[in-house]
Amino acid sequence: VKVRIFDIQNLAVAYICLWATSPMLAFGTVYRLAAVAAVGVWAILEMFRPGGIFTRPTLPVLLTGFFILYTAATEALLGADQNFGWHIQIWIMLFFLVFYESRRDDVRSMSSMFWFLLATLPIWYFLTYTAFDQYGTHTARLLTRTSDFAREVSSDGVGGYSLVYSIVAVLPAVALLLLNYRRFVPLEQPRWLTPISRIPLIVPALITANLVLGFALVVRAGFSIAIILMIFSLALSLIFKRRSPLMLMMLPLFMMLAWLAFQIALVPFLQMIAPLTEGTPYYRKVLDVIETLQNDQSQGTLDDRVERYMRSLALFVQNPIFGVISDRDVGKHSAYLDTYARYGVLVGSVFVYLLTYLPVRMMRGMKDNFGLAFSILSIMVLLPLLNDVFASLGVMLFIMVPVACDLVERARVRGPTAPRRRLAVRWGPRVRPAGARAARMSGPESGRA
């Protein structure tokens, strides 16, 4: 059996992806050390691979190295009492950017990891969704910080903030995959999945499971920003196909409509359909979602967020060049604003570039599915601006989204599949119309002797 370097690297990165997305592996020193070892294996193999990314690094790779070294050196100088958890999440996320850069000319080589993740993610979606019945609708919020409860629940496969927001990042691509699955099934890559993909409806069933369970989990988790971003990004990816100045002009209008729909229409709509579900298993679930959304809107979370955003912005204005370095007074609710406040304009701009580089690159290359690339860019602008980032975001942005876009674009190039021939029963000889027979005789063959 011939084993390529790519195959060993794919196995290593597949474990890192599983570790970043699986709640069961979120805690545990052994799991973390295994992830670090997997990163080391990939990096060593990449160093010795002909044409590896380290021999000819691209600009995003160089900036990633600069960002990691600068932030790591700063934290080391400040001492061990600083919060390393936030940085570790970002460094792991940026590792996937480096991995993507090593495969960006051969995106199909990441297909095995894509389908592996597409098969495992519904497991965590389902376990987290069903956990709401046992622990309550605020379970995802309680898992945002390390605690004994978080360790116990995560060991059962229940995810929290990072799982919910990772769904938002990948859901537009999953939706377009479902609409175009007939054009790339059976799968060409990886080849070992080709026979399995020929099983009727197995691929659309897998994509549908990710779409339906992911959508339901985001709604029931009750994160206001996640719901708004999900609806907004899905609308962009499904409505807009080609590049259009009108689309850019209508973008503020769509954002306003999404916000108004959430603030005004969503809760009344759920209250309207709640009586229709009475007597079914969904009645209690609908009431839980209504209660969660009403509590979220009444607890003053918006005012608290705005105060934290303004705190980080004020620190940046006071120290625009080098930042305040320490995270003591930073708002800690916006990845972009916090980075600008801590490290200044240069490092903050590098961070924004690294998270928006890939969506902008896709917007240049995707013509008929421009809305998908634009929706991903919108997510990567708004999500880190309004919240913190996490390791699994790198999995979605730099592995899941590029492979999904490649499948959708490949469907456009290949064109629609030819319709199947149907069995036709004739009771007599086929009679050609007189006009068709005359046209056939008047062709170039009719002049031959």
What are these regions (language model features)?
Residues 1-73, 105-108, 181-201, 245-249, ...:
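Transmembrane signal-anchor hairpin modules in multi-pass inner-membrane enzymes, especially those
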Residues 23-35, 80-85, 197-242, 263-267, ...:
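Helix-loop-helix junctions and helix-breaking kinks within/between transmembrane helices
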Residues 59-71, 78-126:
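Aromatic-anchored transmembrane helix interface
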Residues 212, 216-218, 234-295, 448:
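A membrane-periplasm/extracellular boundary helix in multi-pass inner-membrane enzymes
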Residues 290-346, 362:
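Long extracytoplasmic/lumenal interhelical loops at the membrane interface
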Residues 342-384, 401:
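Hydrophobic transmembrane alpha-helices and their immediate junctions
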